[in-house]
Amino acid sequence: MSLGILGTKLGMTQIFDNETGTAIPVTVVQAGPCTVTQIKTSETDGYTSVQIGYGDVKEKNLTKPQLGHLKKADAAPLRHLKEYRLDDVSGYELGQAITANIFEAGQVVDVSGNTIGRGFAGYQKRHNFKRGNMTHGSKNHRLPGSTGAGTTPGRVYPGKRMAGRYGGTKITVRKLEVVRVDEEKNLLLIKGAIPGKAGNLLSIAPSNIVGQK
């Protein structure tokens, strides 16, 4: 696995291909800057990884253990911490800044984040069930219909698709293309849609391509 970066979704826009004039839908992401807050090695932790922090926060909003952990890296108070497992951590040091320049245009990345929470939703909205007739004497408009058999088994099987909370879950959208990198402003323009609303916390990491390291 390669080192990724934490960022914030800013919104969507479109850019145009200089050669063909085709409109490309892109999501603008504020990628970092992040700070290396911990380096784990096989000798001390049993595996190798790099932990990074993102998002300035007031000191009073963190606990003393959290502040003590960040102080070891001489890092400012940071809201979010995330760890990326690596094969080799020799090129990183505590307090090192991680910015958008670790990516390049044309690179393929995986983006993780929380989807938009829609609250308690019904069958049509949550599972795309077909509704019943609205006229001709029908009394079944947006009801689920049968949820199972009768006496046997005499219960509803676990996992039955029913109404409930919809969205607000963490997902990963894989193999999205980085269209453009703005190193001065630490912006990434990623082709396509990304989970969540504007302001959502994201983790962006290089995709694992079969046959490549």
Swiss-Prot record:
Superkingdom per UniProt: Bacteria
GO cellular component: cytosolic large ribosomal subunit
Regions crossing the membrane: none
Matches recorded under Pfam families: Ribosomal_L3
Location of the region described as Disordered in the Swiss-Prot/TrEMBL record: 130-161
SUPFAM superfamilies the UniProt entry points to: Translation proteins
Biological processes annotated in GO: translation
Alphabetized GO MF terms: rRNA binding; structural constituent of ribosome
Coiled-coil positions: none
Keywords on record: Ribonucleoprotein, Ribosomal protein, RNA-binding, rRNA-binding
Function according to Swiss-Prot or TrEMBL: One of the primary rRNA binding proteins, it binds directly near the 3'-end of the 23S rRNA, where it nucleates assembly of the 50S subunit.
Similarity-based family: Belongs to the universal ribosomal protein uL3 family.
Assembly with partners or alone: Part of the 50S ribosomal subunit. Forms a cluster with proteins L14 and L19.
Protein's recorded name: Large ribosomal subunit protein uL3
Organism: Picosynechococcus sp. (strain ATCC 27264 / PCC 7002 / PR-6) (Agmenellum quadruplicatum)
